[in-house]
């Protein structure tokens, strides 16, 4: 009988109304779950597999170019699971330019002075580490993704983890 509650419920149901909305809700989980699949063949002695990739942008909707390294870290003693690790690091020059563009757009919207070109020298570090325990059947049993941003005197960390239980 509460109209506000009914309106909120109807709005929330729209999130699950079609496949596209559901994919948007779980996109990060899906990407984390499939992060290691099909990238290369790995052994404990092999060098990390390195490739150019993209990661979420901190300042706009366009993806951030990155370098990704993937490595097989461990094989379980019973050979029924293994641990894969990955590090993605954002391209520093691209990130600085994206930061500067964001500041320029913000200054324009606020009607304030455009930022100095010196802001391009701001040291921003943005990386994501993902570690997953994968069963011999290919299913991930546990995964943790740690996103870190280091900028000026601020460190921001966001962890996402999931575990599949039998």
Language model segments and positions:
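Solvent-exposed N-terminal domain segments of exported/luminal and surface proteins
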Residues: 1-10
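Extracytoplasmic beta-rich ectodomain segments of secreted or membrane-anchored proteins
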Residues: 9-83
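Acidic, serine/threonine-rich low-complexity disordered tracts
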Residues: 52-166
């Amino acid at each position: 009988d509460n109209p506000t509650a009914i309106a909120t419920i109807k709005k929330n149901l729209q999130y699950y109304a079609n496949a596209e909305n559901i994919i948007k809700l779980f996109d990060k989980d899906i990407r984390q779950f499939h992060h290691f699949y099909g990238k290369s063949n790995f052994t404990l002695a092999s060098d990390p597999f390195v490739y150019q990739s993209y990661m979420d942008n901190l300042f706009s909707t366009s993806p951030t170019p990155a370098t990704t390294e993937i490595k097989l870290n461990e094989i379980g003693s019973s050979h029924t699971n293994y641990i894969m690790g990955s590090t993605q690091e954002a391209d520093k020059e691209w990130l600085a330019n994206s930061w500067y563009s964001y500041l320029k757009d913000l200054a324009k919207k606020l009607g304030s002075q455009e930022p100095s070109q010196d802001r391009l020298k701001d040291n921003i570090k943005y990386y994501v580490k993902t570690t997953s325990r994968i069963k011999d059947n290919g299913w991930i049993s546990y995964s943790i993704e740690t996103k870190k941003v280091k900028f000026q005197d601020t460190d921001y960390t966001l962890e996402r983890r999931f575990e599949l239980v039998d």
